[in-house]
UniProtKB/Swiss-Prot annotation:
Function (record text): Forms part of the ribosomal stalk, playing a central role in the interaction of the ribosome with GTP-bound translation factors.
Alphabetic keyword roster: Ribonucleoprotein, Ribosomal protein, RNA-binding, rRNA-binding
Species this chain originates from: Dinoroseobacter shibae (strain DSM 16493 / NCIMB 14021 / DFL 12)
InterPro entries for this protein: Ribosomal_uL10, Ribosomal_uL10-like_sf, Ribosomal_uL10_bac, Ribosomal_uL10_bac_type, Ribosomal_uL10_CS_bac
A biological process term (GO) from this entry: translation
Pfam families: Ribosomal_L10
PROSITE patterns in alphabetical order: RIBOSOMAL_L10
Keyword Isomerase appears in the UniProt entry: no
Annotated family: Belongs to the universal ribosomal protein uL10 family.
GO cellular component annotations of the record: large ribosomal subunit
Assembly mode: Part of the ribosomal stalk of the 50S ribosomal subunit. The N-terminus interacts with L11 and the large rRNA to form the base of the stalk. The C-terminus forms an elongated spine to which L12 dimers bind in a sequential fashion forming a multimeric L10(L12)X complex.
Name of this protein: Large ribosomal subunit protein uL10
GO molecular function, one term: large ribosomal subunit rRNA binding
Source taxon at top rank: Bacteria
Length: 172
């Protein structure tokens, strides 16, 4: 890799560190190619990406960035998992770490905040953006359905009273 390619890679990594909602750093030593492809596929499904880069170049890309502290995690065979959604990459990485003992989460960053292993697990346990939107929508919709039920209730009560009166009149 010549100098121009390295500079381009540093710029790309810098963009990743700046624009991602979450970045997870993990060791992947011992993973087979098939296992790594499976991890990449899972990450793509969730809207995230996976990048293996030279640690030295990643550390250069982190210089001056708010999440520069994750450079301390970049030792050995590391992989970067990232996504714009602040939860997606952490969820996939945590689930994959549970399925495969060779994949070990070291930590990461969420925006400007440094995350240790426990922090990544905590982020992974949070609901995703879509789940939060669904929860908010159901909370907003519940009062409206209650009001509609309350408005419709007197009409159904009147109808049942009228049918009862009609039945009594027919019986008499």
């Amino acid at each position: 890799m010549d100098r121009a390619q390295k500079e381009k890679l540093v710029d790309e990594l810098g963009q990743i560190f700046e624009s991602s909602g979450v970045v997870v750093v993990a060791h992947y030593a011992g993973l087979t190619v098939a296992e790594m492809q499976d991890f990449r596929a899972r990450m793509r499904e969730a809207g995230g990406s996976v990048r293996v880069a030279k640690n030295r170049l990643a550390k250069i890309a982190l210089q001056g960035k708010p999440n520069e502290k994750i450079g301390e995690l970049l030792t050995g065979m590391t992989v970067l998992a990232y996504s714009e959604d602040p939860v997606a990459a952490a969820k996939v990485a945590d689930a994959y770490a549970k399925d495969n003992s060779k994949y070990q989460i070291l930590g990461g960053a969420m925006g400007e905040d440094y995350l240790d292993q426990a922090g990544v697990k905590a982020v992974a346990s949070m609901p995703s953006r879509e789940e939060l939107i669904a929860q908010i929508a159901s909370c907003i919709g519940a009062p409206a359905s209650n009001i509609a039920g309350a408005i419709g209730a007197p009409a159904s009560n009147i109808a049942s009273i009228l049918s009862t009166i009609e039945e009594k009149a027919e019986a008499a």
